[in-house]
């Protein structure tokens, strides 16, 4: 009350803080997934509000929250075509037509994006490096990730690309 009355403050922005599901991104879109025991400790908007509202309500201020990533993160995907498959005997690579200029987050932050075949596959999963065509060592979407074996012409979906994926894209190389 003191903040509002003595200082003329009307709003309190608590910022963001709500993350998204990177692993199980696709499965977490199903309500049944959230009923699992493993999901009980995940911070949801309801749990966030239940924790903060009782503490902030006495201030008498309008509370602002910035849930952008929570809303848009899993709303976008990057679909890419496998251009070439390379097996060195020690490493298995899927070289795709998307590159770090299309989704820079893995190169910048080593961020995790679930990668799945667009067409469901019963192929055996193999540890795969999914890499782009740019001549940079950072043009890598994942390393040693178990992904069903792919072939040239297959399409992969990189999930959780909705927040910042497009706005951070560039025209490099």
Predicted feature locations:
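Charged (often Lys/Glu-rich) extended helix/loop segments that serve as interaction or gating elements
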Residues: 51, 60-173
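Active-site loop/helix belt of alpha/beta enzymes
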Residues: 1-81
């Amino acid at each position: 009350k003191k903040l509002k009355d003595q200082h003329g403050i009307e709003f309190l922005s608590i910022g963001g803080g709500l993350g998204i599901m990177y692993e199980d991104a696709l499965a977490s879109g199903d309500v049944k997934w959230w009923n699992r025991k493993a999901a009980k400790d995940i911070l949801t908007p309801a749990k966030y509000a239940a924790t903060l509202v009782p503490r902030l309500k006495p201030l008498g201020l309008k509370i602002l929250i910035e849930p952008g990533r929570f809303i848009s993160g899993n709303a976008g995907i990057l679909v890419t075509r496998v251009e070439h498959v390379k097996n060195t005997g020690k490493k298995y690579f899927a070289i795709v037509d998307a590159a770090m200029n299309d989704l820079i987050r893995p190169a910048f932050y080593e961020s995790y994006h679930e990668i799945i075949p667009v067409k469901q596959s019963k192929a055996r999963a193999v540890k795969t490096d999914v890499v782009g065509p740019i001549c940079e060592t950072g043009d890598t979407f994942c390393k040693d990730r178990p992904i069903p074996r792919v072939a040239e012409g297959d399409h992969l979906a990189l999930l959780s690309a909705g927040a910042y994926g497009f706005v951070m894209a560039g025209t490099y190389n």
